[in-house]
UniProtKB/Swiss-Prot annotation:
Residues of the ABC transporter domain: 1-240
GO cellular component entries: plasma membrane
Domain Mop, first and last residues per copy: 299-369
Encoding gene, per UniProt annotation: modC
Native source species: Rhodopseudomonas palustris (strain BisB5)
Residues in the signal sequence: none
Organism lineage string: Bacteria, Pseudomonadati, Pseudomonadota, Alphaproteobacteria, Hyphomicrobiales
Protein name: Molybdenum import ATP-binding protein ModC
UniProt family annotation: Belongs to the ABC transporter superfamily. Molybdate importer (TC 3.A.1.8) family.
Subunit structure and binding partners: The complex is composed of two ATP-binding proteins (ModC), two transmembrane proteins (ModB) and a solute-binding protein (ModA).
Primary localisation category: membrane
Amino acid sequence: MRAISPRMIRGEFRGRLGGFALDASFSVPATGITGLFGPSGCGKSTVLRCLAGLQHLPGSLCDVDGDVWQDDSTFLKPHQRPIGYVFQEASLFQHLSVKANLVYGAPRGDAGGAAGVIAFDEVIELLGLARLLDRAPRNLSGGERQRVAIGRALLSQPKLLLMDEPLSALDRLTKDEILPFLERLHARLSLPVIYVSHDITEIERLADHLILMRAGHVIGVGPLSDLQSDPALPLATARDAAVNFAAIAEAYDANYGLLTLRVDGGRLLVPSGPVEPGARRRIRIAAGDVSLAREAPRATSILNALSARIVSTSPVGPNEMLVVLGLGPNGNGARLLARVTRRSWDQLQLAEGIEVFAQVKGVALASERGVSEATK
């Protein structure tokens, strides 16, 4: 068997499925949420089925946290793999109550608070299911059914949770209701999750790492922010390009309702309610909300102007330049994207390697309660 370093999930899946050729290799941390993203039909769900053992491609490899589920001499069947699987449509037992659905398939016996065990009461709290326990599935909304399906998967005590576009069958309002619950799961549980979606807003809200696919191939693997800011990949050149990264709350100004966030390479002021110092927050800054200046701006309504250095540039269409910025005077901090016109580029005499000020006109602050837009 081929051993790899622990705390990683490694997949090498190759083969033909009818007219579709899959050649997908990746290695991601066995912690947090890894997004599996790409256009419809690129092979995302097929990779998930390979991880689950529902699809057998001979000669492939599947290693989860040091346990080999598939290699040249091994193939564990789906029931032998400690996985939880959440599908696009919640498949609940209609003749059972919500509570009975939740405990169906859970390991028998009392775990007694054993390390790593996900407790029933914890799942009920995290997913907001207490008032639903005695209901029948037919009396639940689409979002409630999906929350029950997620809870049932968690209570099976999986080593890996697979989620195949779990929000795709829901309308936007229902998606917005469920996303905060998924964020809470992410914050409270150490269980690794592979999350399939073709909706970039879900990936930006939830994922720590990303597997980017196109036409059956993996074209990028790594931390979400790294792939978002790589001009060689499609996320950076998209019209709605943005970068997500972690921030730490430092102070709150109750007089102005402004939260000071420390990021790698600078500080940001964001309109917000009170937040405890040290709390971690996730922020999103769109390329279209970043403008550049050669000197520190004065007398402006824009709250945030960060020292940065131009790391790289590339043309986007005939009129614009995509600029990758590194925060901090040396450019060693977090990466940002900016889109500037070619005219502005020439007039400001911008070039790779020079120091600039990145004026951030808008910051999306994600929290357990959702996303609030902070502008100017």
